[in-house]
A protein has these predicted regions:
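Conserved alpha/beta-hydrolase
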Residues: 42, 60-79
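N-terminal cap/lid segment of alpha/beta-hydrolase-fold proteins
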Residues: 1-38
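Serine-hydrolase catalytic-loop signature spanning alpha/beta hydrolases and amidase-signature enzymes
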Residues: 46-49, 70
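Catalytic nucleophile-loop/oxyanion-hole region of alpha/beta-hydrolase
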Residues: 74-94, 100, 107
Length: 183
C-alpha cells in the first residue's frame, strides 16, 4: 500500500495493511521495531454520507515512530452511532493478528491494547471501556487504557456546571452574560 501524500512514516520499515471487514474499511500499521502494544484510533463524526474512510490523525505518526502498532476503522456506517464505532473498532482489534498473518507477518498477540479518539471518536473510546460495553458488546475487548478526546462525554449535569461556572466568571469579571459584543 502506498503512503499518503505528506506521510512521514518510513514505509520501508512499517507494515501497512488496508481492507474491508464487516462492511468497515480499516488500516493497520506495524513498525519493524514494534513494542508489542496496539493503539486503536476512533475517528470523529463524518456526517451521513456513504463514503467510509480511515483518517490520518497527527498522533498516528508519533505512535508508529515510538514503536506502537496503530489501527483504525471507518466504522460500517456513518452517523453518530457510538455502538457501531465500538463494535467495528473492537472487531478490528480482535482481528489484528489474523490480518498480520494474512499479509505474511507473524506477530505475537499485543501485550497491551489502548484506545483513543477525537470528537465522536473520543465518545467511542470512552464508551468502549465502560462496564456496559464490556458486558454487552458482541466483540469484547478489555482495553488497558483509553484517551477519549471529546467534549460531549459528560452528561447534562456536567454541562450545567460548565454553564454556571461561565456565568459566575462573567459576573465576577463584570462582563454581561448576553449578548457579548467584545470577545
Amino acid at each position: 500500500m502506498a503512503a499518503d501524500a505528506g506521510d512521514t512514516v518510513d514505509m520501508s520499515t512499517t507494515s501497512r495493511w488496508a481492507g474491508v471487514r464487516g462492511g468497515a474499511a480499516y488500516r493497520v500499521e506495524v513498525p519493524a521495531n514494534w513494542n508489542g502494544k496496539l493503539v486503536m484510533y476512533t475517528h470523529g463524526y463524518r456526517g451521513t454520507g456513504a463514503a467510509l474512510t480511515v483518517s490520518n490523525p497527527s498522533i498516528r505518526r508519533h505512535l508508529i515512530q515510538q514503536g506502537y502498532a496503530w489501527a483504525a476503522s471507518s466504522y460500517s456506517r456513518n452517523y453518530y452511532d457510538v455502538r457501531a464505532g465500538v463494535e467495528d473498532t473492537n472487531a478490528l482489534a480482535l482481528a489484528f493478528n489474523e490480518i498480520a498473518a494474512a499479509n505474511g507477518r507473524s506477530l505475537a498477540a499485543p501485550s497491551k491494547i489502548y484506545i483513543t479518539g477525537h470528537s465522536m471518536g473520543g465518545h467511542i473510546a470512552a464508551a468502549a471501556v465502560e462496564a456496559e460495553a464490556i458486558a454487552n458488546a458482541r466483540n469484547k475487548v478489555r482495553y488497558h487504557g483509553a484517551v477519549p478526546m471529546c467534549g460531549v462525554t459528560g452528561d447534562m449535569e456536567l454541562f450545567n456546571t460548565f454553564q454556571a461556572m461561565q456565568v459566575a466568571a462573567q459576573a465576577i469579571a463584570g462582563v454581561p452574560a448576553y449578548p457579548v459584543t467584545r470577545w
